[in-house]
UniProtKB/Swiss-Prot annotation:
GO cellular component: cytosolic large ribosomal subunit
InterPro entries recorded: Ribosomal_uL13, Ribosomal_uL13_bac-type, Ribosomal_uL13_sf
Organism (species): Neisseria gonorrhoeae (strain ATCC 700825 / FA 1090)
Function: This protein is one of the early assembly proteins of the 50S ribosomal subunit, although it is not seen to bind rRNA by itself. It is important during the early stages of 50S assembly.
Protein name: Large ribosomal subunit protein uL13
PANTHER family: LARGE RIBOSOMAL SUBUNIT PROTEIN UL13M (PTHR11545:SF2), RIBOSOMAL PROTEIN L13 (PTHR11545)
The keyword Disulfide bond belongs to this UniProt entry's keyword annotation: no
Subunit structure: Part of the 50S ribosomal subunit.
Length: 143
């Protein structure tokens, strides 16, 4: 018996919507990353993008545990000497709601062309409305 390997043109993708209101950042991010990779499917193949499309709504209402709301820091660098910038989780959620979730998921995906293709299937919205009603997404409940 030969080992099954998924072909890119045979992959069936579905659309799911996740309501992130009052959900913990890391728990949402791990479920999203797993579904973007396609690990929940029996035809999962590591070198083929078998994942689904994920829409996350209410990303501005994500929560973190402990004191991370004030203590968790996000860093970026301009490339110039002394050009490091930092933001706390609170500042990140105020200025760019949803970016913390995007960065958390991106860090859980493979680096390289396959990971870049996977992250494009993630759609994050700060409010309860999204622009993908035509795709008829299924509601995905998280524990």
């Amino acid at each position: 018996m030969k080992t099954f390997s998924a072909k890119p043109h045979e992959v069936k993708r579905e659309w799911f919507v996740i309501d992130a209101q009052d959900k913990v950042l890391g728990r949402v991010a791990t479920e999203v990353a797993s579904r973007l990779r396609g690990k929940h499917k029996p035809e999962y193949t590591p070198h083929v993008d078998t994942g689904d499309y994920i829409i996350v709504i209410n990303a501005d209402k994500l929560r973190v545990t402990g004191a991370k709301f004030e203590d968790k820091k996000y860093f970026r660098h301009s490339g110039f000497p002394g050009g490091i910038y930092e933001r706390t989780f609170r500042e990140m959620q105020d200025q760019f709601p949803g970016r913390a979730l995007e960065q958390a998921v991106k860090g859980m995906l493979p680096k390289g062309p396959l990971g870049y293709a996977m992250i494009k299937k993630l759609k994050v919205y700060a409010g309860a409305e999204h622009a993908h009603a035509a795709q008829q997404p299924k509601v995905l409940e998280l524990k």
